[in-house]
Design a protein with these regions (language model features):
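A hydrophobic/aromatic-rich effector-binding and dimerization subdomain
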Residues: 4-27, 32-37, 94-162
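Conserved long hydrophobic alpha-helices within structured protein cores
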Residues: 84-100, 176-179
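Short beta-strand-to-loop capping motifs
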Residues: 69, 119-121, 166
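A structure-centric signal for secondary-structure junctions around beta-strands
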Residues: 42, 62, 111-113, 173
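Generic protein-terminus/edge-of-domain signal
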Residues: 1-89
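Residues in well-ordered beta-strands of folded domains
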Residues: 46, 66, 101, 118, ...
Length: 191
């Protein structure tokens, strides 16, 4: 049985979906919580509250490890929609649209809600060519293209975020790799 198509002038035919905004370096201001680009390599930390111009349906070229520390609401990650609350940890792959919308915010907003680490694929891929140990990251990063939610990692993920944020140079890279190693172990145990 088929259903007749609505006339082309109907409201449903005119309904348009909103495409995610592609975020780029030019609109990543330190005023929004980003680290200055001259102070970071391929690993960037970000902390922000809610509401903020950063909370919107968007995507970007980098992977994003996203941790929620306050409020609850609805998460939109790729084609998945579900609840979030403090402790929500997700790894989003490049160009995977995402947004977290808080539903329980006080009138004055929340100063700290999100802890984020963004990183590029290229440097990791290049490192895999000469440093075989990096290859253990690739299955995790492949799965992240559709988003991976991690349960029970909030405290350790936040601790790793602060360690990465406070570190510079090779210590920052080592702290970042420790953070990814935690995710790799967890993902292997919870397939």
């Amino acid at each position: 049985m088929t259903t007749p198509s609505p006339p082309t002038n109907s409201k449903s035919a005119r309904h348009k979906t909103r495409q995610p905004e592609l975020e780029a370096d030019y609109n990543r201001s330190t005023a929004l919580g980003y680290e200055p680009t001259n102070e970071v390599g391929f690993i960037r930390c970000l902390e922000h509250g809610y509401p903020t111009p950063l909370a919107r349906w968007h995507c970007h070229e980098e992977y994003e490890l996203h941790m929620i520390t306050a409020t609850s609401g609805k998460a939109f990650i790729g084609d998945w929609i579900g609840p979030f609350e403090p402790g929500h940890v997700v790894l989003c792959g490049p160009k995977l649209p995402h947004n977290w919308i808080s539903l329980d915010i006080p009138p004055e907003g929340v100063e700290h809600r999100d802890l984020v680490i963004q990183f590029q694929h290229g440097p990791i891929d290049q490192a895999c060519q000469t440093i075989p140990e990096f290859a253990e990251l690739l299955p995790l990063l492949e799965r992240a293209r559709h988003g991976i939610e991690f349960f029970g990692l909030s405290e350790s993920s936040q601790s790793h975020w602060h360690h990465v944020k406070e570190s510079k140079g090779s210590r920052r890279l080592a702290a970042f790799l420790e953070s990814l190693k935690l995710l790799v172990r967890f993902a292997k145990q919870h397939r």
